[in-house]
Amino acid sequence: MRYLTFEKIRTIDPIIDAQKISRKKAAFLSVGITFLVILFVSLNYEPLLGPDDVGIRNILSGIYTGTPEAHTYFMYYILTKVISILYKWFPNIYWYVLFLALVNYGCLTLILYRFLCIVDRYKLIGIWSVVAGFLILWLPFFITLEWTSAAGILSATAIFWYATVPDRKDRNELLRDYILSFILLFISCNLRNDVALLAIPFAGVVFLWKLSRNKSFFSSAFLHTQLLFVILSMVIIVMSRAVDSFAYSSDVW
């Protein structure tokens, strides 16, 4: 009887895994849905910029000063420097608008991909219902592109990705999965630091939740990886602030 019980428990994981959608199929579906959203928005709406974004774009593109300029307002210097360089190299491309659109649609793709990877096939009807409602709520941000909402979307996606990383035992695998969260948080911090800081408490809740799920976290590589994630996240924020302060350290500013 004990043997039969053991065999039954041991075979649960393969059955569950068999019900999962493959990563390739999840990637194909998420990209396909995002493409359909882009097509729908482009055919029915004309993307707009918020008032602050118009000013930021005009500074970055050189409309105000005659040459692309990285010293603008609110956004940190690391990000504005990259965008201003792109305007210098290819002035006929709307880089700022393209960047905000890439943030919105890129984060949508990542969230859809993660949803499809973590749910089994028999729950897809419920997931599609959630996705439909999600898209309706997100639609205004696809139409009117704003830097504040884009920073919030980046932070939310970073935390969502961090929360849904599987609790693997291998530290290198965990770090590879966390790299994307670092990148998203880094861009959010440089796009609008205040919004990124508002999202940090949610990351802390996820951090504590992950630790509470692991009974042996005090002596495991899992704890070290989680602490490394927190430390690197703080380094991202401090480094972005330090570079921005140095860029505006001249008496002229």
Give the ranges of each region predicted by the language model:
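Transmembrane-helix motifs of polytopic, lipid-linked glycan transferases
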Residues: 102-121
